Amino acid sequence: EVGSLSSVNELRSLIQLSALNFFVLNEEEIIGFIICFREGSEYHSPNYKFFSDCEDKFLYIDRVVIKKEYRRMGAGTSLYEHLSKVANLENLPICCEVNTNPINQISLNFHSKNKYIKVGQGYFDDHSVAYLKRK
């Protein structure tokens, strides 16, 4: 599951446009990754735009992917801990969105546990999201 991406080329383009991306390994296997953008990017996501309109400097999480059989085993926490260290170097808030319709309760719980607070709501034709931020 990589959100609304339709091809490997689209993922490659997203990575090239991103400001920060890294992955987590289990031995030699990539089991997860995160893709992030900074302010001022050419990225045209409406969710990214929400934060662009209200934050001067920020780190936006666009994608987090953990291979299904490795979920709830600490891989996501590891990615977020590393991301927090990077953000702290420049005192950047970390921003993201989580689906609220259909609800992604696991992700909402994860972000709440990691001190993300709701700063807005986005409504779209086929879904809605909560905008979250961690200082």
Which residues does each predicted region cover?
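Conserved GNAT acetyl-CoA-binding A-motif
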Residues: A87-T100
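Conserved acyl-donor/pantetheine-binding loop and adjacent beta-alpha core of acyl/acetyltransferases
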Residues: I35-R63
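Conserved acetyl-CoA-binding loop-helix of GNAT-fold acetyltransferases
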Residues: I66, R72-K85
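Active-site rim helix/loop that mediates acceptor-substrate recognition in acyltransferases
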Residues: E1-E27
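Conserved active-site alpha-helix within GNAT-family acetyltransferase domains
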Residues: T100-G120
